[in-house]
């Protein structure tokens, strides 16, 4: 039985929740998010809280209810506060610049890398070696950050590459003669 699913999600003032079958729409000051939940999950909205439980006849009902609760909690946080993800570029000549909804990266390749941002995601570069991603959808921000990191992952000898701001890169010792 899922302990996560037993905790209700508190819906703050100014957030509108619409339940249409298994399709949940949450609208707040930062935007609107929609998600289709698994058929094994039953969602109830009462007194500014969302409660979750399994439907009869589904073996994985509690597990799916816990997943649905975590997803909807992230949606509520996203439309009220939003999410940010910070990336750092470590290496000589590694630079980033934002032009509109395109991030231009110089990562030591013979060509610049241009990454198109999806709708709803904004980026800014406080310095040439930092990227800050902002948006309402936690999953999309994480995917964009992972895509940017995949262009040049931190290598284990000097730690050069694109890394998350809170990431600790374990370095190896160089070969000795």
Swiss-Prot record:
It holds the Pfam family Ribosomal_L6. GO terms for biological process: cytoplasmic translation. InterPro entries: Ribosomal_uL6-like, Ribosomal_uL6-like_a/b-dom_sf, Ribosomal_uL6_a/b-dom, Ribosomal_uL6_bac-type, Ribosomal_uL6_CS. Gene3D superfamilies: Ribosomal protein L6, alpha-beta domain. One of its GO terms (cellular component) is cytosolic large ribosomal subunit. The modification N6-acetyllysine is found at residue 44. It comes from the Bacteria. Keywords: Acetylation, Ribonucleoprotein, Ribosomal protein, RNA-binding, rRNA-binding. One of its GO terms (molecular function) is structural constituent of ribosome. Disulfide bonds: none annotated. Part of the 50S ribosomal subunit. This protein binds to the 23S rRNA, and is important in its secondary structure. It is located near the subunit interface in the base of the L7/L12 stalk, and near the tRNA binding site of the peptidyltransferase center. Belongs to the universal ribosomal protein uL6 family. This is Large ribosomal subunit protein uL6. It comes from Shigella sonnei (strain Ss046). The gene is rplF.
């Amino acid at each position: 039985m899922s302990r996560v699913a037993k905790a209700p999600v508190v819906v703050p003032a100014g957030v509108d929740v619409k339940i249409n079958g298994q399709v949940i729409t949450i609208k707040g000051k930062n935007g609107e998010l929609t998600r289709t939940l698994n058929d094994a999950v039953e969602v109830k909205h009462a007194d500014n809280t969302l409660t979750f439980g399994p439907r009869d006849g589904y073996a994985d009902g509690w597990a799916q209810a816990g997943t649905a609760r975590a997803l909807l909690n992230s949606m509520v946080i996203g439309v009220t506060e939003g999410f940010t993800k910070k990336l750092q570029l470590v290496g000589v000549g590694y630079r980033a610049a934002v032009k509109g909804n395109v991030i231009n990266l110089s990562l030591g390749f013979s060509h610049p890398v241009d990454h198109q941002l999806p709708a709803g995601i904004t980026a800014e570069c406080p310095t040439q070696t930092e990227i800050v991603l902002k948006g309402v959808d936690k999953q999309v921000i994480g995917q964009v950050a992972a895509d940017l990191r995949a262009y040049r992952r931190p290598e284990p000898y000097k730690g050069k590459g694109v890394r998350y701001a809170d990431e600790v890169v374990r370095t190896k010792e160089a070969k000795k003669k």
